């Protein structure tokens, strides 16, 4: 197939010009200007061009594209031909080219199929059915390729060879599938033809079915064992062939049948690459739905996407891109593992704790801030002794915040829970308790400072302003809170630092001189930009001067103030001790929280480990469960096999019981029925002669009401019908030994069981006889009627000639059986009839009766009615004989009247018979008397012997057995001896055996066979019929 290029019109499907038609692809508009725009190629429509024309065109039009010449492949215009396109000549003109002069008679009949069935049977009798013509074609090849199912069925019945190959190594099944003759193909499959035989191109029957888009035939081939992965010489499986030929429906069918999507042709191309090269977006989409590998490369190292890009198949490129994106998303979703996420969370948690030890972020709290006015005195004390408390402040700061995370005192663990998840309430309550203690202390100090040094309204105003600024700062500069736990206010931390500094100053024995000044300076210095400690406004102007008398008062006041300061200092020390105690408790709480956090991390790691152990345990349990299921299935299969074997044993026991129940006494003895064309003979096995012998005729009233005073019946059988022949229409249900009217034949059997033998057929096994060349359909119909209509418990069908041979005590010989309707010559070797040497002659007693009526009519005697015909038959059986030398007998009768005989008719009239009594049987040896061109009975017997194997001819010559009522004429054995001796080799010994009771020899042979102890193993039981149907008669009755 040639790839479709989006920017160019589709290539034309017109046949290619020049001698390259069978080798090159389709022509496109790059090659001929006349193709452009129309999409069709007009070159080559008027005939092939010569080489000079091709060279001229080539020189004018420049480079040829890869659709036209293999030398242009790889130019980038089409990727299909990068490795060479496939030769589709195997699929071109599937039917045979037949010339009449090349075929013989049988092959012509098989090809045309316009031959009568009986003529075709005669052809098959004289011709080898497996004969091949010049092109190695058999009759089965020709009939299958041309759809002559009737001929095919007849050839299969003749057991012709099924897997014969013609000159292209194709079987008859291959030709039937290739020519889409489904009926013939199904018949061949049912008879066991191998569907996997490749032809010279490597194609099997499934390849041709896929090429023809015949899904029903492909399904049938797969049911009969066709290989779905067979490859032809191009490396194409049926799936690759369907993709290459853009057969979307059969490709979809093969995908459902689990065809290998990753199979490669001889160039390493997958089905996807072939679909891309062929430009079939629908097949590409169908293959992508099956998750096919899109990254596979052919032998040139190119992928399907590269072919699509180079061929400008934009739709296919988009399909491949979308498929790849879906695969990437699927892979990314599969790679996300919950256990791995939890592990990463634990690692991040540990790194966060490490970071909290090195850096302390600014704390935030939801608790109300401590009033800043209450801190001013402590802050002034801090400024006064600034040089002595730096280390202590650092230690205190580090001690308070030890173990803090990024967000405050109690860091929040990173997990899948919401960010506002809180720690347990006991930790939060402990923290709140510490903060309340600090608040109480500040409230105690705040009234003193606020009453002496500040204006309440001004302080409240300043506090509100500072609070609003702090909130703005927290909104703009503070990091996002990870916890809702309360944090210690910065002012509270600063107050603790101040008290620690005062205590340090006590230890070093600081002087009291300048304390107020230092305190004042510390307060002034502490007034920073953030306005935590605003300066107190003096009520006197700065430039105000005090007199000297007031100066002394000032010093006395200063001493009082100093004394107050010492008192306050002592109170501060007491408070400092309490704060240290609370601080230690706070550190303990933080350490406890850290230990609990590490414990929770450890628990998480333990949970992860336990989770992985549980997963492994679940996997082991699943594996154990699968093992148990598999073992259960094996045990179930074994139990079913045991049940099946026990069932078979029980069936065999039932069969044995049924056989044992059928004892050979008069009540359940085997019924033997010989169905002849003229007479029906019936009786019980083991008897010397049949108990019932009656004509095989059925009579129906000619008009309703003709038998009005009598008990009128719809039909009459046998002697009763013969006695009423004047008012009945008589019919013979058998013609030339073959049953033609099954309704009348069923009436004869019913009459045999209930009127002649007076037995119930459902209580007796039955042995029926048949003609040697009885059709298979007749055998099956006979079996069906016995089992379904008469419900017989068992039955067997035997060939009449074999039973005649058994009567003479032989198992090897040739039987010439001539009855009322047909004559057969059947060679038998070691108890087996030879069908290829069996011959049939439609000349017997009925034809002799008609001939005798004719010659008597020439003498002036008229016999026209059925009753008169019976009179003629009686004359034939009582007076006629076979002349040893016909010419001599004719001369004797002409010269003397002493050989004439008289016969009295029922009405008293006497007729005279001269040469008619030996002229009538002479027609058996000279059928030309009757206007027939066939051979006589002696030549037919000789021809059967000659068709047999050379090694057994001697046994046949010495064991020639006569059978049937027509062989009862006196002189028959001597005439046969004389005629066959004249035909056989001079040194060959001839022996004709003519049993005295040969009129009933067929029935007697059946009686002998049915009385054998081994006969029970030969017959067909009702159970076997129910299991296999009527076709079982072909397997058990040979």
UniProtKB/Swiss-Prot annotation:
ANK repeats lie at residues 135-164, 168-197, 201-230, 234-263, 267-296. Residues 666-1038 are annotated as: Actin-like. It holds the Pfam family Actin. Keywords: ANK repeat, Coiled coil, Repeat. GO terms for biological process: axonogenesis; cell motility. Residues 605-661 form a coiled coil. Residues 340-355, 364-387, 429-446, 458-493 have a biased composition (Basic and acidic residues). GO terms for cellular component: actin cytoskeleton; actin filament; axon; cytoplasm; extracellular exosome; extracellular space; membrane; NuA4 histone acetyltransferase complex. Signal peptide: none annotated. GO terms for molecular function: protein kinase binding; structural constituent of postsynaptic actin cytoskeleton. Residues 448-457 have a biased composition (Polar residues). InterPro entries: Actin, Actin/actin-like_CS, Actin_CS, Ankyrin_rpt, Ankyrin_rpt-contain_sf, ATPase_NBD, CC144C-like_CC_dom. Residues 332-493, 507-561 are annotated as: Disordered. SUPFAM superfamilies: Actin-like ATPase domain, Ankyrin repeat. In the N-terminal section; belongs to the POTE family. In the C-terminal section; belongs to the actin family. PANTHER family: ACTIN. This is POTE ankyrin domain family member J. The lineage of its organism: Eukaryota, Metazoa, Chordata, Craniata, Vertebrata.
């Amino acid at each position: 197939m040639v790839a479709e290029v989006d920017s160019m019109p589709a290539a034309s499907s017109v046949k290619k010009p020049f001698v390259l038609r069978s080798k090159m692809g389709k022509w496109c508009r790059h090659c001929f200007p006349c193709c452009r725009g129309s999409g069709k190629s007009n070159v080559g429509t008027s005939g092939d061009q010569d080489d000079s024309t091709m060279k001229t065109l080539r020189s004018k039009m420049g480079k040829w594209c890869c659709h036209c010449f293999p030398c242009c492949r790889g130019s980038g215009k089409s990727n299909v031909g990068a490795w060479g396109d496939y030769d589709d000549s195997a699929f071109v003109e599937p039917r045979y080219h037949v010339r009449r002069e090349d075929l013989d008679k049988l092959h012509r009949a098989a090809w045309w199929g316009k031959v009568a069935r009986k003529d075709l049977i005669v052809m098959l009798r004289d011709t080898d059915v497996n004969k091949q013509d010049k092109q190695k074609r058999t009759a089965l090849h020709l009939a299958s390729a041309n759809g002559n199912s009737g001929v095919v069925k007849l050839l299969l019945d003749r057991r012709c060879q099924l897997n014969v190959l013609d000159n292209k190594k194709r079987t008859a099944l291959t030709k039937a599938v290739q020519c889409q003759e489904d009926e013939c193909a199904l018949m061949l499959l049912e008879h066991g033809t191998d569907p996997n035989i490749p032809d010279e191109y490597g194609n099997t029957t499934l390849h041709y079915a896929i090429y023809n888009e015949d899904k029903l035939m492909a399904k049938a081939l797969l049911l009969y064992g066709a290989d779905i992965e067979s490859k032809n010489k191009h490396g194409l499986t049926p799936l690759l062939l369907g993709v290459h030929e853009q057969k979307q429906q059969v490709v979809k069918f093969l995908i459902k049948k689990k065809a290998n999507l990753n199979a490669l042709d001889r160039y390493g191309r997958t089905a996807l690459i072939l679909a891309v090269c062929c430009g079939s977006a629908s097949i590409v989409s169908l293959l992508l739905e099956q998750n096919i590998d899109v990254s596979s490369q052919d032998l040139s190292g190119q992928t399907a996407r590269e072919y699509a890009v180079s061929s400008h198949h934009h739709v296919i490129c988009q399909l491949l891109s979308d498929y790849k994106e879906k695969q990437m998303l699927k892979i990314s979703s599969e790679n996300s593992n919950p256990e791995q996420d939890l592990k990463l969370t634990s690692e991040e948690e540990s790194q966060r704790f490490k970071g909290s030890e090195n850096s302390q972020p600014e704390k935030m709290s939801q608790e109300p801030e401590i009033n800043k006015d209450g801190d001013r005195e402590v802050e002034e004390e801090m400024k006064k002794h600034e040089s002595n408390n730096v280390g202590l402040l650092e230690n205190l700061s580090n001690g308070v915040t030890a173990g803090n995370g990024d967000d405050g005192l109690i860091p929040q663990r990173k997990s899948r829970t919401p960010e506002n998840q809180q720690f347990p309430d006991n930790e939060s309550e402990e923290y709140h308790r510490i903060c309340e203690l600090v608040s109480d202390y500040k409230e105690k100090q705040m009234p003193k400072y606020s009453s002496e040094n500040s204006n309440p309204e001004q302080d409240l105003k300043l506090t509100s302003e500072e609070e609003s600024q702090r909130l703005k700062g927290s909104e703009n500069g503070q990091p996002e809170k990870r916890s809702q736990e309360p944090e210690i206010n910065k002012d509270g931390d600063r107050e603790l630092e101040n008290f620690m500094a005062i205590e340090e100053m006590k230890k070093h024995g600081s002087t009291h001189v300048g304390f107020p000044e230092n305190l004042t300076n510390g307060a002034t210095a502490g007034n920073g930009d953030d306005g935590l400690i605003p300066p107190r406004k003096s009520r006197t102007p700065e430039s105000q001067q005090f007199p000297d008398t007031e100066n002394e008062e000032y010093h006395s006041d200063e001493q009082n103030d100093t004394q107050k300061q010492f008192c306050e200092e002592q109170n501060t020390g007491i408070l400092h001790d309490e704060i240290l105690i609370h601080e230690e408790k706070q550190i303990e709480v933080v350490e406890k929280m850290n230990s609990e956090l590490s414990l929770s991390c450890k628990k998480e790691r333990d949970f992860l480990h336990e989770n992985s152990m549980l997963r492994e345990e679940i996997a082991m349990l699943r594996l154990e469960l699968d093992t148990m299921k598999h073992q259960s299935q094996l045990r179930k299969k074994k139990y079913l096999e045991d049940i099946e074997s026990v069932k078979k044993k029980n069936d065999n026991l039932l069969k044995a019981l049924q056989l044992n129940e059928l004892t050979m006494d008069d009540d359940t003895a085997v019924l033997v029925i010989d169905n002849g064309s003229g007479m029906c003979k019936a009786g019980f096995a083991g008897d010397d002669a049949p108990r019932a012998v009656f004509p095989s005729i059925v009579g129906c009233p000619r008009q309703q009401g003709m038998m009005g005073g009598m008990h009128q019946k719809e039909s009459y059988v046998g002697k009763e019908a013969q006695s009423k022949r004047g008012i009945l229409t008589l019919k013979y249900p058998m013609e030339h030994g073959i049953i033609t009217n099954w309704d009348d034949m069923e009436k004869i059997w019913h009459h045999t069981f209930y009127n002649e033998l007076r037995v119930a057929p459902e209580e007796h096994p039955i042995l029926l006889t048949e003609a040697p060349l009885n059709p298979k359909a007749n055998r099956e119909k006979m079996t069906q009627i016995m089992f379904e209509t008469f419900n017989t418990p068992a039955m067997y069908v035997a060939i009449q000639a074999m039973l005649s041979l058994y009567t003479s005590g032989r198992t090897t010989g040739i039987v010439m059986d001539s009855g009322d309707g047909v004559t057969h010559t059947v060679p038998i070797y070691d108890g087996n009839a030879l069908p290829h040497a069996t011959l049939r002659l439609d000349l017997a007693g009925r034809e002799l009766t008609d001939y005798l009526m004719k010659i008597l009519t020439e003498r002036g005697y008229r016999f026209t009615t059925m009753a008169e015909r019976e009179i003629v038959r009686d004359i034939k059986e009582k007076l006629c004989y076979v002349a040893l030398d016909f010419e001599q007998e004719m001369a004797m009768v002409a010269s003397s009247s002493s050989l004439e005989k008289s016969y009295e008719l029922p009405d008293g009239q006497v007729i005279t018979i001269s040469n008619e009594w030996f002229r009538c049987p002479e027609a058996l040896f000279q059928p030309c008397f009757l206007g027939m061109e066939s051979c006589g009975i002696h030549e037919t017997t000789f021809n059967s012997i000659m068709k047999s194997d050379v090694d057994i001819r001697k046994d046949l010559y010495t064991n020639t057995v006569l059978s049937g009522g027509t062989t009862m004429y006196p002189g028959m054995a001597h005439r046969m001896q004389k005629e066959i001796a004249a035909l056989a080799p001079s040194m060959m010994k001839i022996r004709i055996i003519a049993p005295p009771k040969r009129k009933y020899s067929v029935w007697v042979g059946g009686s002998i066979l049915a009385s054998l102890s081994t006969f029970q193993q030969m017959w067909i039981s009702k159970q076997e019929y129910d299991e296999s149907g009527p076709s079982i008669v072909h397997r058990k009755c040979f």
